[in-house]
């Protein structure tokens, strides 16, 4: 890859794979693609987990329930420093936190409509 997308990313959120990760690894998750050396990528918020949750809900003929899909980072963080949810649901925790006076988005002035929201230090959650 030429890495021009890395230079253009306003968030510096792209990573370049310098190594070859294509070796046989019996422990690899078959649902997660492993990009070859020379490819730029960024976090997908575990899109494969979202797809699985959608497929499960569709097979069961129901809507996805809140919390049914959580990226691995949100699931693994014991401090709950990463909260994930539906911003379009005003009752969701993530939606309430997004409306907090502590909430801010990076590079919002560039018109990129960021969906990752950060909270400044302060009292409790939202």
Predicted segment positions?
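Non-ligating segments of multi-cofactor redox enzymes
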Residues: 1-126
């Amino acid at each position: 890859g030429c890495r021009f997308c890395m230079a253009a990313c306003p968030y510096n959120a792209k990573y370049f794979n310098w190594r070859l990760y294509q070796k046989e690894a019996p422990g690899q998750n078959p649902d997660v693609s492993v990009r070859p050396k020379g490819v730029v990528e960024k976090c997908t918020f575990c899109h494969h987990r979202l797809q699985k949750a959608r497929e499960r809900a569709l097979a069961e003929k129901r809507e996805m329930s809140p919390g049914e899909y959580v990226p691995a980072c949100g699931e693994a963080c014991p401090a709950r420093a990463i909260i994930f949810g539906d911003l379009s649901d005003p009752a969701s925790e993530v939606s309430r936190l997004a409306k907090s006076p502590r909430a801010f988005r990076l590079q919002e002035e560039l018109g990129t409509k960021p969906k990752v929201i950060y909270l400044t230090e302060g009292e409790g959650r939202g």
